[in-house]
Amino acid sequence: MSKLKGPDGRIPDRLPDGRPAVAWERRWTEGTLPLWLVATAGGIAVIFVLGIFFYGSYQGVGAGG
């Protein structure tokens, strides 16, 4: 982690010479929970919920009674 912190405690986006403060490789892997993991879990949850809706829409189709 960089020791350069702003008045609110956040790390600045850029260093004084213009370079990024955090390397692009680490932007997706730092933090409490990696963003790619949250996005993957969210995507799976959306597919699951849509699957339940599609399953429910076809239940009873073709049933004679």
UniProtKB/Swiss-Prot annotation:
<protein>
    <recommendedName>
        <fullName>Photosystem II reaction center protein J</fullName>
    </recommendedName>
</protein>
<dbReference type="Pfam" id="PF01788">
    <property type="entry name" value="PsbJ"/>
</dbReference>
<keyword id="KW-0602">Photosynthesis</keyword>
<dbReference type="InterPro" id="IPR002682">
    <property type="entry name" value="PSII_PsbJ"/>
</dbReference>
<dbReference type="GO" id="GO:0031676">
    <property type="term" value="C:plasma membrane-derived thylakoid membrane"/>
</dbReference>
<keyword id="KW-0812">Transmembrane</keyword>
<feature type="transmembrane region" description="Helical">
    <location>
        <begin position="35"/>
        <end position="55"/>
    </location>
</feature>
<comment type="similarity">
    <text>Belongs to the PsbJ family.</text>
</comment>
<keyword id="KW-0793">Thylakoid</keyword>
<dbReference type="InterPro" id="IPR037267">
    <property type="entry name" value="PSII_PsbJ_sf"/>
</dbReference>
<keyword id="KW-0604">Photosystem II</keyword>
<keyword id="KW-0674">Reaction center</keyword>
<keyword id="KW-0472">Membrane</keyword>
<dbReference type="GO" id="GO:0015979">
    <property type="term" value="P:photosynthesis"/>
</dbReference>
<comment type="subunit">
    <text>PSII is composed of 1 copy each of membrane proteins PsbA, PsbB, PsbC, PsbD, PsbE, PsbF, PsbH, PsbI, PsbJ, PsbK, PsbL, PsbM, PsbT, PsbX, PsbY, Psb30/Ycf12, peripheral proteins PsbO, CyanoQ (PsbQ), PsbU, PsbV and a large number of cofactors. It forms dimeric complexes.</text>
</comment>
<keyword id="KW-1133">Transmembrane helix</keyword>
<comment type="function">
    <text>One of the components of the core complex of photosystem II (PSII). PSII is a light-driven water:plastoquinone oxidoreductase that uses light energy to abstract electrons from H(2)O, generating O(2) and a proton gradient subsequently used for ATP formation. It consists of a core antenna complex that captures photons, and an electron transfer chain that converts photonic excitation into a charge separation.</text>
</comment>
<dbReference type="GO" id="GO:0009539">
    <property type="term" value="C:photosystem II reaction center"/>
</dbReference>
